[in-house]
């Protein structure tokens, strides 16, 4: 009798979104009887350990990217860190070769970690960003896409967490004119939450995440405005594993982190959500059809594009961080005519992808058994 398939799941460490969107993926792998190993560190590892304490965790150093304090400085900050990023990609590739041999890995699912592919093991890249946005216009987009596809095409497959029909939730990011050569599966939006009946309690929910120092800068900006706002607020800082909380007014309930179950309850009770325009956050808000105010990270071209796309379809009210006023934003949201995408069978693409992966593993195991016989 064959042993359970051993699947390595490795999320990127830019904020918490890559880890949270791996949760429904891991759930389905476990339902299919797989033995799941997780490669991560820091906040992403802590979040997944909270949800899945039974899994096997391997330490893998993240890219540890830090953003600039200003939008204009972000491009320069990323450029300075590029040599270290390329070194990290090379290092994780070498790490994977050792890990596959040591633990008998049958397949790798990498969420935006570009060095985690292996010549002898089926390797999947999960990304919604096929078209990377730049500040250089269409020529810059095309040049970066060509370089990006060189990385993507090293994998055996690419899974895109969005609807297959354009424009989807991510617009041109996930539905570019030209696609990579590797087989592509649109998973549908990935959310750790299940649609349910809201039990509104008329508070504003603040959900923070994202790389530093921008997470802290937005937190400080919002905390400074809470006294003058005055309405009930649940403030989730997005800092799993952190001890200690800042002082806040009596009408504010502040927490460092909430697990998936508690966060779903918090979302269903909120009349309005304030968060970054991170794509994983967008998927979760659309799954629950929650009204939101989204604040793109300054200088982050992907989030700037997403903000324009979401505003165009009226999926969210998106406002810049510079000059953001909490009370005025809530008033604008009350007048905003929200619409939401039609909820489809969101797990069908994910089920297809996982079952296809397991079929390939099974075929490989049978071929190896025949060869050894």
Which sequence ranges carry the predicted segments?
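Active-site proximal beta-strand in glycosyltransferases
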Residues: 119-135
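C-terminal amphipathic helix plus adjacent low-complexity
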Residues: 327-373
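A nucleotide-sugar donor-handling region in carbohydrate enzymes
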Residues: 134-213, 237-241
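Donor-nucleotide binding loops and adjacent catalytic segments primarily
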Residues: 26, 174, 188-272, 282
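A short, glycine/small-residue-rich beta-strand->loop->alpha-helix junction that serves as a flexible
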Residues: 11-23, 213-216
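Conserved nucleotide-sugar donor-binding subdomain of glycosyltransferases
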Residues: 74-115
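A donor-sugar binding/catalytic signature common to diverse glycosyltransferases
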Residues: 263-305
């Amino acid at each position: 009798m064959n042993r359970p398939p051993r699947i390595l799941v490795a999320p990127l460490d830019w904020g918490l979104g890559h880890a949270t969107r791996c949760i429904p993926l891991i759930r389905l792998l476990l339902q299919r009887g797989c033995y799941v190993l997780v490669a991560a560190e820091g906040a992403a590892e802590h979040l997944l350990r909270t949800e899945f304490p039974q899994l096997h965790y391997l330490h893998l150093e993240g890219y540890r990217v830090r953003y600039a304090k200003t939008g204009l400085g972000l491009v320069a900050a990323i450029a300075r860190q590029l040599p270290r990023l390329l070194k990290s990609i090379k290092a994780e590739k070498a790490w994977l070769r050792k890990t596959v041999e040591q633990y008998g890995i049958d397949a790798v699912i990498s969420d935006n970690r570009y060095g985690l592919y292996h010549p002898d093991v089926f390797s999947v890249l999960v990304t919604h960003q096929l078209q990377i946005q730049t500040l250089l216009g269409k020529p810059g987009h095309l040049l970066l896409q060509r370089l990006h596809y060189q990385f993507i095409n090293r994998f055996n497959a690419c899974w895109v967490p969005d609807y297959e029909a354009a424009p989807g939730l991510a617009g041109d990011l996930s539905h570019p004119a030209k696609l990579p050569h590797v087989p592509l599966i649109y998973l549908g939006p990935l959310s750790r939450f299940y649609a349910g009946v809201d039990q509104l309690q008329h508070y504003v929910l603040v959900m923070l995440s994202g790389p530093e120092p921008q997470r802290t800068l937005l937190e400080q900006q919002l905390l400074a405005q809470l006294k003058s706002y005055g309405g009930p607020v649940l403030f989730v800082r997005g800092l799993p594993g952190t001890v200690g909380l800042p002082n806040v007014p009596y009408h504010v309930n502040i927490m460092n982190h909430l697990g998936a179950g508690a966060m779903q309850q918090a979302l269903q009770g909120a009349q309005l959500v304030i968060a970054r325009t991170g794509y994983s956050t967008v998927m979760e808000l659309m799954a629950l059809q929650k009204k939101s105010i989204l604040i793109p990270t300054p200088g982050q071209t992907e989030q700037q594009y997403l903000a324009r796309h979401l505003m165009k379809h009226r999926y969210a009210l998106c406002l810049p961080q510079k000059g953001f006023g909490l009370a005025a934003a809530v008033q604008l949201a009350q007048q905003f005519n929200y619409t939401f995408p039609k909820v489809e069978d969101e797990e069908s693409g994910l089920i297809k992808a996982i079952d296809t992966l397991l079929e390939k593993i099974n075929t490989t195991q049978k071929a190896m058994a025949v060869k050894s016989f």
